Amino acid sequence: MPVDAAEYAAALRQYAAGVVLLTVRDDIDDVGTTVTSLMSVSADPPLVAIGLAAEGYPAEVLQSIGSCAVNVLGAGQAILASRFASAGRPSARHLLESVPWRRAPVSDAIVLDGALAAMDCTVHSVVPAGTHVVVLLQVEGVPVLADGDPLVRLRGRWTDGAGAPLRRP
């Protein structure tokens, strides 16, 4: 018996997820997208997995380039998460004009200086999964590691680590 799409979406909204900004530097520009489907896969070798819409440009660019940065966002970075979750967004560099960042050593992707953590990654493998792809990323380095409250997505809202909704600045 097929699962009702609305019930499926409602069930997943009950699951709190950390928020990351995935960035890729291609031959022309920088691409970034907000992702809530990050998980640790292995400590040796260090692998994480992300889910991306199979037909989306970020998945296409990531598979073509083969490397990226994964920036773990803090509770004070909800505006950034919203910017990079919007359809038809401009270059990542334009969306980060007032935000300090640098290049990751291996991927050359954007790493946010204010992220809680940033992982410099190469693509290990890609697994088709319905409307999405699951991308296994090998972590080549951790150029940013800080302490702070994480940004969390819960019930369609940005929240802090305790689940309290964040107010717009």
Regions found by a protein language model. Name each.
Residues 1-169:
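Basic, polyanion-binding surface patches
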